[in-house]
Every structure is written in C-alpha cells, then in structure tokens.
UniProtKB/Swiss-Prot annotation:
This is Sensory neuron membrane protein 2. Belongs to the CD36 family. Residues 28-522 are extracellular. It is a multi-pass membrane protein. The lineage of its organism: Eukaryota, Metazoa, Ecdysozoa, Arthropoda, Hexapoda. Glycans are attached at N66, N274, N310, N324. It comes from the Eukaryota. One of its GO terms (biological process) is sensory perception of smell. The chain crosses the membrane at residues 7-27, 523-543. Disulfide bonds join C320-C388, C349-C415. InterPro entries: CD36_fam (IPR002159). Residues 1-6, 544-556 are cytoplasmic.
Length: 556
C-alpha cells in the first residue's frame, strides 16, 4: 500500500508543475492577448476614447534666449544670450476622426491642438515678461530676399506696376531705369547684375522701416505672449512699395505669419498650432498586427514627404523623406531591451530613431528608457549616407565646402519655407564652428537630450519629451544697411520640450489595471511553484524518515 506522504508529495509536484506552467506559459500568454486586445483601436473601445482625447495634456515648455547686447551685435560684437523660462503650457490634443478603412486596420484623422498657459508651473515667469529676441520674420525675409532676389522682384512686378504711376518717387526711378536699360514691361524685370539694382535696393532699404516698424536692429523688444502665440505685428498700414512687400509676405504662405483683422501681419512661433489642424494623418489601428499600432501610414494622402532631396533623378524616395513611427503620443507594445523605435515629427519634417538605453522605474512602474542616437543631426554629407538632408539653401553662412552644415545643425528651409536651423538645446553636440560664436550657451546632456521612458509591455509613455532648438543665421546681407556690420553667427531663438509626465491619477489607474494584476499573477506563480515544491520535498523527506524508523523483526 502506497504511503499517504508519497501521494501528497506527488500532488505537490503537480502543483509545482502547474505553477510553472501558469507563470511561464499560461499567464504571459493571457497578458499578451489582453494587451493586444487593449491596444487595438476599435470604434467605441476604451482605447479609441483614449486615442481621440489623450487622458492627460502634454507639457509644452518653452525657453527663450534673451539677447543682452543687441546694440553691440549691430556693430559686430559676439552675441551674448541668457536663457529665460520655462514658460509652461498644457497642450491638449483632440483627434477628429474622418473614417476607418474597410478592414479596420487604418484610421484617418485631423488633430486639433490647444495650448493653455500654466501660470503655476511657469512661476515666476509670466507671458507679459519683456524680452529682446531675434527678429525672426524680418531676418527670414531679408535672407529669402538675398537668395531669390530676381524671383522676388518679378513677384512684386504685377503689384508694383499698378502703383508706379501713382507714386512720384518711383515714377522718377522708372524713367531713369528706362534710360539706362531701355524700355521694359516692368521696372522690376531686371537681372541681379543690372546696374539699376542698386537704385531699387535704396527703395527697399527705405521701405523696411514701413514694413517692419522702423527697426533699429535685427532684434525686437516684445512680450513672451506676442513672440510665442499672439504675434509681433508688422506691415501696419503700409503704402506703395511697402504694401507690395507686405502682400508678397502675406501670400508666401508662411504658417508663422497671420493676417490681423486690421490688415496688419503678425509673426508668432506657435500661434498657427493653436486651434484646428489641417494635416490628415492615417495610422495603423493595430488590427491584425498590434506591433504596428499608431504607426503613421500616410500624411496628407502620401506615404512619404516631398521635403528633402530624393535618392535619384527618377525621384526614388530617400531615407530622409520616409515617414516612420508614431507621433510620440504612444508607442507599439512588447518592447525589448536593445531594440529601437521611430517617432515622426511634422514640425521638423522628419522621422527620428530612438534607441534603448537602460531599464528605469517611474513611480513604481518598470520601463525602458529610449534616447536619440548620434545620427540624429550629426555630420551630413555623402560620406555619412544622409546627403539628402543637405539642401544647401543658405548663402554666405558657416558651412562646409560641400554646402552642408557642420555637425549638430539641420537646415529646415525646405520644411518651414524659412531659413530656420534645427539643433539640440544650447547646441548640444553641435560643432564648435557654431558654439564658439555665441556666449551664454550651457549644453547639458541630462537637461537637453531627447528621451522617453516607456512601459515595455503596453508601449505607454511614462515620462520624457522631444527637445529641440530653433535658430537662424545672423549675417551681413549685401546692400542692406541694417545688416551692414553684423557678425556671421548661428543665432539661437528658443528651445522647446514637448512631452509628458504621467500624473498621479494615471499612475494609479495604470497600476490598478496592469501592475497590480501582474504582481498578483507573479505571486500566484511563485506561490504555487514554491509551495508545490516545498510540499513535495517535505513529504518525501517525511516518507524517507518514516521508512528509516521501521524496526526489523529479530532473527530466530
């Protein structure tokens, strides 16, 4: 007859095997399937509601480079800047869904973004703080003018011809030009080498005052509110040539310049982002392939950008124009150590690769940290297999012989239709060719590197943000008086951090729905495994012990 301890020991082994099976096979498969179901975007689901309205707003922090020696810069001095901020805004995102694809694997939407100033988080800074900053709109106009002078003049021609006979000074100029070059259809239909160009530039210099509010330097004194959102006004009641210039600026289509109700124009960095969106996104819902959830499939009905140089004369799409990854509001699930992932930013017209760095803990939630690699805005050129970013749209600036910018700087001219240069904050990692020309920069990898902490199982972002800086070259432009003595420098304007820190409510929700469940399953796993092994071993020892106590009968 089998001893009861052997039966109990066998049961203990069964319990241990069951615990191992549950902990290493059944529970992971159950969790994996549950996560797959929860991340897929289906009409009416909880994930769909979170997709349409983010559960909490993003943090949008702006740091401004206040210029402390603007008068001396006009005379050729090296710029001195001081960082002020952060000015913190809550960024609310709401998606207006257009439609699902027939098979439910794609969803199209337009995203509306709204910014609310967070006075508490920004204190002691306020939106009414006064700053002296780079006059972005005037500087951009002059540099575009320098690069495309003939096209700009021809663009002005139709408007100006109707005004020439109404403006006495210009009538005289027209007669003089006709004597010099013969009769023309338009006084502006001239080449860059035309001797009459100097006379026209005199009028341009004179009309800069009317266009840009009588500027005394390439810097503007304004409020943070105006510089970032409400707009720095210019083109206030212009006349003659000034009005033609303003009309040309207005019709250039720049997102950062808007027309006011009184007809004037206003420049702001982010005013155009505050309100209804225009770009139509198509993203993967995760149906059929949860690893592709939120992956951008199309932007404005195109799989690729048409911003950067393409790989061949036949128009083969270059790596620079490829749209990869999500919009950084969430990431695909089931992350692994050592992997990488992409985010796409429409603000800089490119995809950015993030690489695994280390394991982290965020308020008791385990995750992985990802950060940009050295290839983000490193050296650009054929020898680095990224020459498609070398648009070479800037004249007479600090750049290499091949026309590409030095390491750490990316020309966004073709992205923003303005000569804006992207760097990391405080020009972190940028070439000394740029950093040596500015005083007051304090690059710090911990403060200025882009990173994101992600819960590895679900792909939920825990904290982190995109950190980038917007700059513009400051330089002397031939025959433009206000720029005559300027040094050639890459001038910082602002840097921004757009990201998230999961708040207490979301942390509690996340722990309740996932972390506590995982802990419970883990406890069940190890309790059954260890308990079963313990019972089996204990009963086996007891059985052996009892066998040893059996007294053999004496031999007769």
């Amino acid at each position: 007859m089998i001893h009861w301890s052997l039966i109990v020991s066998a049961l203990g082994v069964c319990v241990a095997v069951l615990g191992g099976y549950c902990g290493w096979i059944l529970f992971p498969n159950m969790v994996h399937k549950k996560v797959e179901q929860s991340v897929v975007i289906q009409d009416g689901s909880e994930q769909f509601k979170r997709f349409v309205n983010l559960p909490q707003p993003l943090n949008f922090k702006v740091y401004i480079f206040n210029v402390t020696n603007s008068d001396r810069i006009q005379q050729g001095a090296i710029p001195i800047v001081e960082e002020i901020g952060p000015y913190v805004y809550k960024q609310f995102r709401q998606k207006k869904v257009k439609h699902f694809s027939r098979d439910g694997s794609k969803i199209s939407y337009v995203q509306n973004v709204h910014f609310d100033f967070d006075a508490v988080a920004s204190a002691p800074y306020t939106q009414d703080d006064r700053i002296v900053a780079l006059n972005m709109h005037m500087n951009a106009f002059l540099q575009v003018f320098e690069r495309e002078i003939t096209d700009i003049f021809q663009g002005f021609a139709n408007r100006l011809n109707s005004r020439l006979n109404q403006t006495p000074g210009v009538r005289v100029l027209k007669r003089l030009m006709e004597r010099i070059r013969g009769k023309r259809k338009s006084v502006l239909q001239i080449s860059e080498n035309d001797p009459g160009l100097a006379l026209l530039l005199v009028h341009l210099n004179a009309n800069l005052k009317a266009v840009f509010n009588d500027p005394r330097s390439m810097f503007v004194s304004t409020s943070v509110r105006e510089y970032l959102f409400d707009g720095v006004r210019f083109c206030i009641n212009p006349q003659g040539i000034a009005k033609a210039i303003c009309n040309q600026i207005k019709e250039s289509g720049s997102k950062t310049i808007r027309e006011k109700s009184d007809g004037s124009l206003a420049f702001s960095f982010f005013g155009h982002k505050n309100g209804s969106g225009h770009e139509v996104y198509e993203v993967h819902t995760g149906k059929g392939d949860p690893m592709r959830v939120l992956e951008i499939q199309k932007l404005d009905d195109s799989h690729n950008l048409q911003v950067w140089l393409n790989a061949s004369s036949e128009g083969e799409t270059s790596v620079c124009n490829q749209i990869n990854g999500t919009d950084a509001s969430a990431y695909p699930p089931f992350r692994q150590r050592g992997d990488s992932m992409y985010i796409f930013s429409a603000d800089i017209c490119r995809s950015v690769q993030l690489f695994y760095q280390t394991d982290i803990q965020y308020q008791g939630i385990p995750g992985y940290r990802y950060s940009i690699g050295e290839n983000f805005i490193n050296d650009i050129g054929p020898e680095h297999d990224n020459e498609c970013f070398c648009v070479d749209k800037l004249a007479n600036v600090i750049k290499r012989k091949n026309g590409c910018l030095y390491a750490g700087a990316l020309d966004l001219t073709t992205c923003l239709d303005a000569p804006v240069i992207l760097t990391l904050p405080h020009m972190l990692g940028a070439s000394n060719e740029y950093r040596k020309m500015i005083r007051g920069l304090k690059p710090d990898a911990k403060k200025h590197q882009t990173f994101v902490d992600v819960q590895s199982l679900t792909g939920t972002p825990l904290q982190g943000g995109k950190r980038v800086q917007f700059n513009m070259f400051l330089k002397s432009i031939n025959r433009i008086g206000i720029t005559e003595n300027l040094p050639t420098v890459l001038m910082p304007a602002i840097w921004v951090e757009e990201g998230i820190q999961l708040n207490g409510e979301m942390v509690a929700f996340f722990k309740k729905k996932l972390i506590n469940t995982l802990k419970t399953l883990n406890i069940v796993h190890w309790a059954t495994l260890c308990g079963g092994i313990g019972v089996a071993v204990a009963c086996l020892i007891y059985y052996i012990y009892q066998r040893g106590r059996v007294v053999e009968p004496p031999v007769k």
